[in-house]
A protein has these predicted regions:
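Surface-exposed, polar/charged faces of alpha-helical domains
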Residues: 38, 42-48, 77-81, 104-107, ...
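Sec-dependent N-terminal signal peptides
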Residues: 5-14
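Surface-exposed, charged secondary-structure patches
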Residues: 95-136, 188-193
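Short beta-strand edge/turn micro-motifs at domain boundaries
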Residues: 135-163
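N-terminal signal peptide c-region/cleavage motif recognized by signal peptidases
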Residues: 15-20
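N-terminal secretory signal peptides that target proteins for export/translocation
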Residues: 1-2
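Low-complexity, intrinsically disordered terminal/linker segments enriched in charged
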Residues: 153-193
Length: 193
């Protein structure tokens, strides 16, 4: 399931679009995607790839918002230290899982199909990604954070990355609290090496 969310992040390259030419969110998404694709093609190994793409992804993906939403209402019961640790672990998990799916030299592609604004300060960019002969419908949910558009969720074939993690972490939080969520994320990170 996680592979379906991460392949499109790898698979993006520039293509045509139905969004306005001056669409700040789409322009920002495309620029970040181009950087990641270039870095990924040049990386010699997974460690180098993680190191190089982390600042680019941290600039476009809002890991704090994604982590908070993946944890859900229980987030408010986390201490500030637990919140920082959860964001760090979630970020590491996404980066490791993402880079594990990359094969150097491949040239995945994406078609930018449309932009929609479900509410002020929010945009959904619909795409179709083609990777290894498979086609994926991908929607990037972006939010305006004080003039800086960031991705707050990725929806693959109708399934939200944030909702997928939330379905896993809700039960853990209900049974074991914040400490249990941290331990679950630690295990997932350890398993992703």
């Amino acid at each position: 399931m996680i592979t379906r969310f991460l392949i499109p992040l790898l698979a993006l390259t520039l293509s045509g679009s139905l969004c306005a030419a001056d669409s700040a969110p789409e322009t920002r998404l495309k620029a970040s995607v181009n950087q990641v694709v270039t870095i990924a093609k040049q990386a010699k190994d997974r460690t180098a790839l993680i190191t190089a793409v982390k600042p680019v992804l941290a600039n476009i993906l809002n890991f704090e918002t994604m982590t908070r939403r993946a944890i859900g209402p229980g987030w408010r019961q986390f201490t500030p230290d637990q919140q920082r640790e959860a964001v760090h672990l979630f970020t590491t998990l996404i980066l490791r899982t993402y880079t594990a799916k990359f094969t150097p030299g491949e040239s995945p592609s994406v078609e930018y199909k449309s932009c929609a604004s479900p509410s002020p300060g929010r945009v959904e960019i619909s795409t179709t990604s083609l990777y290894r002969g498979n086609r994926y419908d991908v929607v990037y949910r972006m939010e305006d954070q004080s003039g800086n558009w960031t991705v707050s969720d990725v929806v693959i074939e109708g399934v939200s990355l944030v909702a997928n993690y939330r379905s896993q972490l809700d039960e853990t939080f209900a049974q074991q609290g914040a400490a249990g969520v941290i331990k679950s994320l630690q295990r997932s990170v350890a398993d992703s090496k």
